[in-house]
Amino acid sequence: MSYAGRRIGKAALSLCVTTALTVGVGCGVASATSFDAAAQPIDLGQTQVGMTIEQSQYIARQLKPVPLKVTLKKGPRRPIPEWAKSSIKPNPFFDNDAWRYVRKGYKPGQVMRQRKARWVKGYFPIAARGVQYAYVSYDSRGYPMTATATLVIPHHLKPNASVMEYNQFINSSGPNCSVTTQMNQLFSWGMMTSTIQMVGAALALGYPVLLPDGDGANNIYAINRVASHVILDSMRMVHEQHDFPLAKSHFVSLGASHGGMMTGYTAAEQPYYAPDLTAYVNQFVVNEGAPDLIKLAHSFGLYGELQNAPSVYGSFLMSFVVGAAREYPDLLPHLYQLFTPYGKAVVKGNRSICTPLTFAVGPGV
């Protein structure tokens, strides 16, 4: 298996290990039914709280190698399970209707709609202008999806100036957690602090800044092949948009924590998903990696009763479970049936909120 394949397989394995955190009794996939299941869904085996490495390896052996090049499709993707959907209705700007545009001939990175970034000067006083774009991208299986990004422009913009593409951490599943949403409201729940510092420095030096919403329109946390497509297509979007003279701009991609995961996957995916950008991406910089989710899940399993062994990182794991269920509903069609009442309550509380509120929910996991 390729390096990218191993990494994505590892993420899928982490989901399966994480599933054990909220189950009550053993339950195999074969014991349940679902009309929306894949032909061969993942069998989680006899899941339990103290899941062993051998049990997780049983799951891992079912995972197929990930193809390096995604085959792009035209039809809509599978719907998200009701239990994994956010209780907050997103703004129509984020409607996941890219497949309609693809059928009209739209290409990856092509702009579907745009709007002004309402509070760009509130967050970045040094900025001259900010525009938010919704554009065509593709999910991890090649289905069309809507992606969004904010382009912040400095004063005295030079034609084809190099662009800093910054991947903000999100760590949550709510629809109001994206940078694009945060920059259209006054209060950002602390999401924008590091972004303000990084972006302000780049703008002061005269560089435009690109801020994609790496989790996509469905707020899919930690499924980083999705994020890599969002990011690469945001670069294509910068070349395609007509508001600013950036058709030949080069990029430096930077991210920390969750943003670091997104940046690393983008570096691995770029030669296969967006070879046309090879000459335009100067560097990928992973400032800080995220914790190993598999080791994290196993360490939780050692405690047995997880309600009595709180960890702030439990919020990450719950966001990951929700994100994976949104991206791969057919591969894990019976996941919700394995949750205890406590696990269901944690998911319900986590699926619509942003960092740092997820930390308030997470310690009980």
Question: Can you say where each PLM-predicted feature lies in the sequence?
Answer:
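Bacterial N-terminal signal peptides that target proteins for export
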Residues: 3-16
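C-terminal segment of classical bacterial N-terminal signal peptides
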Residues: 13, 21-32
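Catalytic-loop region of hydrolases
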Residues: 33-158
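Accessory cap/linker subdomain of secreted extracellular hydrolases
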Residues: 42-98, 290-365
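Short beta-strand element of the alpha/beta-hydrolase
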Residues: 148-151, 159-172, 176-181
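Short amphipathic alpha-helix adjacent to the substrate-entry channel of hydrolases
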Residues: 180-209
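Alpha/beta-hydrolase active-site loop
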Residues: 194-197, 221-243
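Primarily recognizes the serine-hydrolase "nucleophile elbow" in alpha/beta-hydrolase
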Residues: 236-307
